[in-house]
C-alpha cells in the first residue's frame, strides 16, 4: 500500500520495516524510515536539538547526524502516517537491502541541504536507491516563482509610469 488509507490522529497504522514515516510538524513534514521493533532511522541537526525544534535549525545546517530512535520519540506530540508515496514511480528495494543500508549509516554525519539533501531525500534514498523530495521541489518552485516575479517588477520599475503602457 503506497498510502495508509486508515490514517487518523489516533491510529496511523502499524508500519512494516522499510516503510516511510511522514511526521507532521508545524509548517513542514519530517521523514523517517521504519526499521522494526518501534525504531526508525532519520537525520537530525548535529547538535542534538530536540525533534520538535529541528525545523528552524535545519534551514541553516549543512550537516546532519543519522540516528536510530524510537518512533514515539521522533514523533513526540506530533502526528504521523505511513506514506510510501513514491512506490508507483520507484520500486522499493528489498526490505533486507533497505535495513542493511540503514544499519550501515547509523551514527554517521552526512551532508544536509534543505533543498537538495534533506530528511525526505535521505529516507527515499534508503528505500528506493534514489533521493526524492516533493517538499523540496515545491520549495524550489516557490523560490523560482518569487525570483521571476521580483525580476518582472524590478524591470517594470525601470520605466516611468506613462511609458509602461507603450511596451505591452
UniProtKB/Swiss-Prot annotation:
Question: GO: which molecular function terms?
Answer: N-acyltransferase activity; O-acyltransferase activity; phospholipase A1 activity; phospholipase A2 activity
**EC annotation?**
2.3.1.-, 3.1.1.32, 3.1.1.4
Where are the catalytic residues?
A: 30, 119
Keyword list, A-Z: Cytoplasm, Hydrolase, Lipid degradation, Lipid metabolism, Membrane, Nucleus, Transferase, Transmembrane, Transmembrane helix
Gene3D superfamilies the UniProt entry points to:
endopeptidase domain like (from Nostoc punctiforme) (3.90.1720.10)
Q: Where is the LRAT domain?
A: 20-135
**Enzymatic reactions:** a 1,2-diacyl-sn-glycero-3-phosphocholine + H2O = a 1-acyl-sn-glycero-3-phosphocholine + a fatty acid + H(+); a 1,2-diacyl-sn-glycero-3-phosphocholine + H2O = a 2-acyl-sn-glycero-3-phosphocholine + a fatty acid + H(+); 1,2-dihexadecanoyl-sn-glycero-3-phosphocholine + H2O = 2-hexadecanoyl-sn-glycero-3-phosphocholine + hexadecanoate + H(+); 1,2-dihexadecanoyl-sn-glycero-3-phosphocholine + H2O = 1-hexadecanoyl-sn-glycero-3-phosphocholine + hexadecanoate + H(+)
Q: Which residues lie on this side of the membrane: Cytoplasmic?
A: 1-138
Which PANTHER family does this entry report, sorted A to Z? HRAS-LIKE SUPPRESSOR - RELATED (PTHR13943), PHOSPHOLIPASE A AND ACYLTRANSFERASE 1 (PTHR13943:SF37)
Q: Which family does it belong to?
A: Belongs to the H-rev107 family.
Q: What is the protein name given in its UniProt record?
A: Phospholipase A and acyltransferase 1
Q: What is the lineage of its organism?
A: Eukaryota, Metazoa, Chordata, Craniata, Vertebrata
Report which gene this protein is encoded by: PLAAT1
